[in-house]
């Protein structure tokens, strides 16, 4: 057995191994390829390498010595010859030998070609080894030569050689990096055009990071490449910054889902008519359905990760787009620049948003042409020149505000999203990235975990919430002023505000080109009166910059509030197009949506740096600082228009439609005016206490107008009736009679009596007696020497009674129409017509407005009611007083004091006849002007007053003949007949005291004395004594006039004796009844 061949074959397996086939040329994979070829051939011939391995493994297990390096064949032969237990089985060895021989023959037959190629490969390998040995020897010789050369070369030359070597390596590296970076410019525009901004930013940053390594420092071509990339970076920054502004302010017409969430709910206003009151009181603590949907949508958008946003298509959702833009800017280290740009553009973009929305409405409704509007309002408003809101104007304003506030809500949510995103950025920004505009990016590492980068710090760049609030408050304030506030209310159709066909830079709206040129800051103005100067400017502008000549809109142009200077003072510049004229009546369209937007803004901008009361404070500031003063000017202006009308205090031509008694035109107009204000300003009337404060002020002024009218009425009547009297005298003082009313002690009692629902007759009679007593005191000047009764202005041709009665009626109607809550059932008759009755309660619904805190306002209105009612009672009491003054004045005219000596004429005196004529005329006028109860109230107690006045005159007479007494009785009879026709409330018309004294006196002194002594009565004693004095004083005056002093003393003694006799007679009658 050729065991050596087997052993060598066993050991010779290594030539086909991987390590032994490594050629000196470095082809390390040669052995592997050979094994693969053999394996494939074995497989094709039906034998596998695995079968040979099993046979070899079996030989190694049973015949281990055969595979050893130091194998000795003789030892195996001895073992085979040994038959003892220590020997080996010879037959088994032969069996193995046969198997191996057969296997080798099979292998030799099968792999004959393989062995041939193996021998060839072995030869090639050995040749390669020899070549490698030759190279090693050559290298060794080169190293020895280099060492010898180095010994002869200085270090400077070596350094230069080393530097050149490094430069060559750097050039190779730069060329490789530049080759890869050059692909950036090919991919960048593709990514930007497809709006893959994040991937474009990531690409720029990665390339920049590679080129920013220290290996490339100082290489000119790299610096030039980076300079080119800086321009690309600036371009991308501009694109991202503009994209951020565009998305934030919805500059592109993209149907973002956020628009539907920010659209107002049309049922929101009707659900709570007191929304403005609750808003100003900060009672709207519960969020509405719309606010909840907005916040839910915002939370969902904020909860998304950057990876989720990148998976979605760009342009489908604004908040996700903003997230991608912010992350892209932060990746480039340009986020502070973008936020600063957004802050600086906030005011201008907010202005553009409002302006574009306004112009869209103008274009939609074609407001360039004159538009006629239909008047849907009551005639009263247009009678006094009010411009109330039409249906067309309401539609335009509502649509404008809906679109505007939808956009502004989106803007606020975008700002909220930006602020939230900036606190949770997932990308990294360079630590030392410059915040200056267009700054160069520093070296960064794109690895998010790199220590060279850090998160964006929002504290380094204050988020511009303050600028946002200032901008939208400015725009909203401007919008409110444009449509609610104006210096003068006017009636003009939309689009009629046209001054010229063109507008240039020097002919701004509202400016006169003859005064100033291009004066928009009020700081620098070129003033020139020369027409040639402006012609030359116009020529230059048309020639050099024709685009500056703008076609002027036919619509009205408002003003805009912008920030200027460090002080941020508000200045006015030309601004928005206003498609309807300003009017306080637009509040019903403007205020609801404005308040709802402010409520939503508080909900959206939930930030600790924003005061929660900013919206309420803003609305309060506008209402109290602008709208309420403007509303008062408006209300006051048209109130003055009503009251200054020449026919204000004249009967309304259709008074029967409103009242059962005649009333003035101004009272009807004022009630209609107040009613229209509440109808056309329902939001204001239901929510603002200030509205009722303004009404209260107007009511006070209305009361003053009526009071002045009453005073002027009396003064005019005095001057008309007594033209010969000097105006400086007290007789024509128009305040005397009114002062006489108010200063008298009976005045408050009369007011109290008239307020009663069912006044008693006894109480009225008692008041009449007190009144008569006070009048007689004034007549006798018993109070002070300065106060005296004024002259009555009543006459048969005077219209004073009518005017004062109409004032009384008008005040009664006004109070019943407006102040039914305070009447307390005191009215004696409902003077309202059926269409004017307050079936629903009071005209002024202050209870609904003020709730439990209405006591103060109720008290103020109660005071106005009391003053108006007192004025009404003043008018009635004034007529009553004038009638009494007329009687007192006429009676005094008929009696010459102290000597009443006339001839009996058989008819009443002329003054009495004029008095009766005036009273009859007055009564007839009162019958047509006043209710029956008020008319009788005027004359109630008059007969008692006349009787007391005549009785008082009797005691003032010093001498009187019988003819005078008969004339007085005739006058009294005529006055009684007239007083019976006026029909007082109760009682017979008679003069018991005056008729008694003048009736007895006509019998003469002798009969008077005899009759009294025969039947003495104590109650007649003063009267009889006065009769005796009057009789004998006349005789004494005649004796003194004739020089009969003795007779004078005799009559004097006679008076004393008769009076003593009367006293004794009365005393005796008392003792002997």
From Swiss-Prot:
Basic and acidic residues composition bias: residue spans: 1-11
Extent of Polar residues compositional bias: 22-33
Pfam families: Sec8_C, Sec8_N
Keywords: Cell cycle, Cell division, Cytoplasm, Cytoplasmic vesicle, Cytoskeleton, Exocytosis, Phosphoprotein, Protein transport, Septation, Transport
Modified residues (Phosphoserine): 450
Region Disordered, annotated ranges: 1-33
Modified residues (Phosphothreonine): 449
Membrane in keyword set: no
Location relative to the cell: Cytoplasm; Cell tip; Cytoplasm, Cytoskeleton; Cytoplasmic vesicle
GO terms for cellular component: cell cortex of growing cell tip; cell division site; cell tip; cytoplasm; cytoplasmic vesicle; cytosol; exocyst; meiotic spindle pole
Keyword Cell division belongs to the record: yes
GO biological process: ascospore-type prospore membrane formation; division septum assembly; endocytosis; exocytosis; Golgi to plasma membrane transport; intracellular protein transport; vesicle docking involved in exocytosis; vesicle tethering involved in exocytosis
PANTHER family, sorted: EXOCYST COMPLEX COMPONENT 4
Function statement: Component of the exocyst complex involved in the delivery of secretory vesicles to the plasma membrane. Also required for polarized cell growth and division septum assembly. The exocyst complex plays an important role in the targeting of rho3, as well as the two main hydrolases required for cell separation, eng1 and agn1, to the cell wall surrounding the septum before cell separation begins.
Subunit structure, interactors included: Component of the exocyst complex composed of sec3, sec5, sec6, sec8, sec10, sec15 and exo70.
Name the UniProt record assigns to this protein: Exocyst complex component sec8
Organism: Schizosaccharomyces pombe (strain 972 / ATCC 24843)
């Amino acid at each position: 057995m050729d065991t050596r061949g087997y052993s060598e074959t066993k050991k010779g397996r290594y030539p086909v191994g991987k390590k032994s086939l490594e050629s000196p040329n470095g082809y390390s994979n040669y052995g592997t390829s050979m094994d693969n070829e053999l394996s494939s051939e074995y497989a094709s011939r039906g034998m596998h390498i695995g079968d040979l391995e099993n046979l070899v493994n079996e030989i190694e297990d049973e015949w281990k010595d055969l595979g050893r390096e130091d194998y000795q064949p003789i030892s195996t032969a001895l073992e085979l010859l040994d038959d003892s237990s220590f020997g080996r089985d010879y037959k088994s060895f032969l069996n193995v030998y046969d198997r191996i021989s057969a296997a080798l023959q099979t292998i030799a037959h099968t792999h004959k070609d393989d062995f041939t190629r193996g021998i060839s490969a072995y030869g090639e390998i050995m040749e390669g080894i020899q070549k490698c040995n030759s190279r090693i020897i050559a290298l060794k010789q080169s190293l020895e030569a280099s060492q010898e050369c180095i010994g002869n070369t200085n270090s400077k030359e070596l350094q230069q050689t080393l530097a050149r070597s490094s430069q060559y390596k750097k050039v190779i590296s730069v060329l490789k990096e530049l080759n890869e970076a050059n692909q950036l410019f090919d991919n960048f525009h593709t990514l930007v055009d497809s709006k893959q901004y994040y991937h474009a930013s990531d690409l720029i940053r990665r390339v920049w990071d590679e080129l920013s390594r220290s290996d490339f420092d100082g290489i000119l071509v790299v610096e030039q490449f980076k300079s080119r990339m800086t321009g690309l970076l600036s371009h991308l920054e501009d694109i991202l910054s503009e994209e951020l502004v565009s998305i934030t302010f919805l500059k592109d017409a993209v149907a973002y889902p956020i628009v539907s969430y920010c659209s107002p709910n049309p049922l929101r206003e009707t659900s709570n008519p007191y929304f403005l009151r609750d808003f100003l009181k900060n009672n709207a603590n519960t969020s509405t359905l719309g606010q909840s949907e907005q916040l839910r949508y915002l939370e969902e958008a904020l909860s998304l990760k950057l990876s989720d946003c990148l998976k979605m298509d760009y342009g489908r959702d604004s908040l996700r787009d903003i997230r991608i833009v912010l992350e892209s800017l932060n990746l480039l280290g340009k986020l502070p620049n973008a936020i600063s740009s957004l802050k600086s553009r906030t005011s201008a973009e907010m202005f553009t948003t409002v302006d574009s929305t306004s112009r869209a409405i103008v274009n939609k409704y074609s407001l360039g042409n004159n538009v006629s509007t239909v008047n849907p309002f009551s005639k009263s408003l247009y009678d006094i020149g009010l411009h109330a809101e039409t249906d067309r104007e309401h539609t335009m304003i509502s649509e404008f505000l809906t679109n505007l506030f939808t956009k502004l809500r989106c803007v606020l949510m975008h700002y909220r999203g930006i602020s939230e995103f900036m606190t949770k950025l997932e990308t990294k920004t360079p630590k030392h990235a410059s915040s200056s505009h267009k700054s160069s990016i520093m070296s960064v590492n794109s690895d998010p975990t790199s220590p060279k980068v850090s998160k964006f710090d929002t504290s380094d760049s204050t988020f511009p919430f303050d600028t946002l609030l200032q901008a939208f408050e400015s725009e909203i304030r401007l919008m409110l002023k444009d449509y609610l506030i104006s210096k003068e209310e006017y009636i003009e159709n939309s689009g009629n505000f046209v001054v010229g066909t063109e507008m240039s830079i020097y002919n701004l709206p509202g400016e006169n080109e003859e005064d100033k040129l291009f004066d928009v800051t009020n700081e620098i103005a070129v003033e020139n009166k020369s027409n040639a100067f402006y012609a030359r400017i116009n020529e230059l502008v048309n020639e050099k910059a024709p685009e500056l000549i703008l076609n002027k809109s036919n619509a009205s142009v408002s003003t805009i509030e912008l920030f200027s200077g460090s002080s941020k003072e508000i200045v006015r510049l030309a601004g928005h197009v206003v498609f309807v004229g300003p009017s306080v009546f637009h509040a019903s369209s403007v205020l609801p949506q404005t308040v709802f937007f402010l409520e939503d803004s508080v909900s959206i901008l939930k930030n600790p740096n924003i005061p929660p009361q900013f919206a309420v404070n803003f609305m309060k500031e506008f209402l109290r600082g602008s709208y309420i003063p403007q509303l008062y000017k408006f209300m006051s202006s048209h109130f003055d228009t009503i009251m200054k009308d020449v026919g204000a205090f004249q009967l309304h031509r259709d008074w029967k439609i409103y009242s059962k008694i005649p009333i003035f035109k101004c009272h009807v107009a004022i009630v209609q005016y107040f009613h229209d204000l509440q109808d056309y300003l329902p939001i204001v009337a239901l929510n603002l206490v200030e509205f009722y404060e303004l009404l209260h002020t107007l009511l006070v002024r209305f009361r003053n107008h009526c009071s002045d009218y009453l005073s002027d009425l009396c003064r005019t009547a005095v001057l008309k009736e007594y033209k010969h009297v000097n105006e400086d005298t007290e007789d024509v003082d128009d305040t005397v009679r009114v002062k006489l009313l108010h200063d008298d002690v009976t005045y408050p009692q009369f007011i109290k009596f008239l307020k009663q629902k069912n006044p008693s007759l006894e109480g009225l009679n008692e008041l009449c007696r007190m009144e008569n007593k006070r009048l007689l005191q004034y007549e006798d000047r018993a109070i002070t020497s300065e106060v005296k009764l004024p002259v009555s202005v009543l006459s048969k041709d005077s219209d004073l009674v009518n005017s004062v009665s109409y004032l009384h009626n008008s005040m009664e109607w006004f109070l019943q129409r407006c102040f039914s809550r305070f009447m307390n059932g005191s009215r004696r008759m409902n003077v309202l017509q059926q269409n004017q009755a307050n079936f629903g309660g009071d005209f002024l619904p202050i209870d609904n407005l003020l709730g439990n805190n209405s006591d103060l306002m109720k008290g103020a209105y109660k005071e106005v009611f009391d003053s108006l009612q007192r004025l009404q009672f003043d008018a009635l009491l004034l007529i009553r007083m004038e009638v009494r003054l007329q009687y007192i004045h006429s009676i005094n005219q008929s009696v010459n004091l102290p000597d009443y000596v006339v001839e009996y004429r058989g008819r009443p005196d002329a003054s009495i006849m004029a008095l009766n004529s005036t009273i009859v005329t007055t009564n007839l006028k009162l019958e047509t002007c006043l209710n029956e109860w008020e008319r009788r109230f005027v004359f109630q107690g008059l007969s008692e007053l006349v009787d007391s006045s005549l009785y008082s005159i009797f005691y003032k007479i010093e001498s009187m003949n019988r003819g005078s007494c008969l004339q007085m009785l005739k006058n009294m009879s005529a006055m009684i007949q007239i007083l019976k026709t006026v029909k007082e409330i109760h009682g017979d018309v008679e003069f018991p005291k005056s008729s008694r004294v003048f009736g007895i006196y006509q019998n003469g002194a002798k009969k008077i004395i005899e009759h009294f002594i025969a039947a003495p009565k104590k109650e007649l004693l003063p009267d009889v004594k006065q009769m005796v004095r009057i009789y004998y004083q006349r005789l004494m005056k005649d004796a003194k006039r004739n020089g009969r002093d003795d007779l004078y003393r005799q009559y004097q003694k006679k008076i004393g004796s008769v009076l003593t006799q009367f006293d004794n007679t009365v005393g005796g009658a008392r003792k002997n009844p």
